[in-house]
């Protein structure tokens, strides 16, 4: 249930309204927006008389929410959520670009790539330390050593770091990471999601291979219901009948999610296509669709990459792509954030 408050509501009136709802054993969440203040009620609201609530002096109107996700629902939180990542604002009206290799391999590789993507205009650095691979014989990542190398690259470039967590037992390794990424395979690892919800560290949540948008939002709800509101959604392609690309990028998800939720939205054209030559056109399409951030894989030597070289751009290719992203983002009214 959502209660929209009148603009002239007094603080005491709002406090009395919140206290009045305690008798129904529901949780209340007061959201102070730009245009209006809203109280979201989460729990069993069937016993609450809407007319009785509507009669309160400070209440503008009351709405029942049919969707199962509440915290992530735009009706609960009309204004866009802006997530601060070490000074970078995701969802704040400027486009962020997260770039870097699929896997952290060596000190030279990650630092060389980090410097290159920053020079091209990337605002955050990505790199996998713990890698979920289809084959048990494929490179699984450097683990904690990989995170240490990312931190070293951050010291040199100043770029906030984004890396994926696979298992709850590794959570302590991510204490100094700026954004924890939850991959497609773990989107419904609810134990992991709840644990991440008990921190305030930003979480980049990727859509599962065969997941609906509602399932994605319900996974976000798991994190948010534990208290962490810093959730970034990511469209990275879904599995369809088409074998020509690694996945099928669902660009319609971007504007549709923006209607349904206040959370910022990232698009990953690298995993969506699996083909380096398709990354640039799909990145530009994602900017046109209105995404808040792009996540692009870049490797200093893709032909010899330890994982996903086929979808990785060279630094030179990435620099050319960024020129087009910059021009298009300005035209679309969400300009690329400037690297200091």
Residues covered by each model-derived region:
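N-terminal small/glycine-rich loop or linker at the start of catalytic domains
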Residues: 80-102, 131-136, 258-267
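N-terminal amphipathic alpha-helix/helix-capping segment at the start of soluble metabolic enzymes
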Residues: 67-98, 323, 330-340
């Amino acid at each position: 249930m959502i209660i929209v408050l009148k603009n002239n509501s007094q603080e005491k009136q709002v406090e009395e309204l919140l206290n009045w709802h305690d008798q129904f054993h529901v949780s209340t969440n007061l959201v102070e927006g730009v245009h209006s203040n809203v109280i979201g009620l989460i729990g069993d609201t069937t016993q609450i008389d809407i007319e009785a609530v509507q009669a309160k002096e400070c209440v503008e109107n009351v709405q029942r929410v049919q969707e199962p996700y509440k915290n992530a629902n735009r009706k609960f939180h009309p204004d866009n959520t802006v997530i601060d990542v070490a000074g970078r604002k995701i969802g704040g009206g400027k486009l962020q670009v997260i770039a870097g290799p699929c896997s952290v391999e060596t000190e030279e590789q990650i630092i060389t790539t980090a410097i290159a993507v920053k020079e091209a205009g990337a605002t955050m650095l990505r790199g996998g330390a713990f890698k979920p691979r289809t084959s048990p014989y494929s490179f699984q990542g450097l683990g904690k050593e990989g995170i240490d190398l990312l931190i070293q690259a951050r010291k040199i470039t100043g770029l906030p770091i984004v890396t994926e967590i696979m298992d709850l037992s590794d959570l302590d390794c991510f204490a100094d990471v700026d954004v924890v990424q939850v991959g497609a395979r773990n989107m419904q690892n609810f134990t992991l999601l709840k644990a991440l919800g008990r921190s305030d560290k930003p979480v980049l949540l990727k859509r599962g291979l065969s997941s609906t948008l509602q399932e994605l939002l319900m996974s976000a709800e798991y994190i948010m219901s534990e208290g962490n509101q810093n959730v970034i959604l990511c469209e990275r392609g879904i599995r369809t009948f088409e074998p020509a690309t690694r996945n099928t990028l669902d660009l319609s998800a971007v504007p549709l999610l923006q209607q349904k939720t206040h959370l910022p939205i990232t698009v990953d054209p690298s995993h969506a296509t699996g083909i380096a030559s398709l990354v640039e056109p799909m990145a530009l399409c994602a900017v046109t669709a209105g995404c808040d951030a792009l996540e692009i894989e870049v490797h200093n030597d893709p032909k010899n990459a330890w994982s996903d070289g086929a979808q990785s751009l060279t630094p030179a290719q990435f620099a050319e792509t960024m020129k087009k992203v910059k021009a298009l983002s300005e035209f679309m009214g969400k300009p690329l954030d400037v690297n200091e």
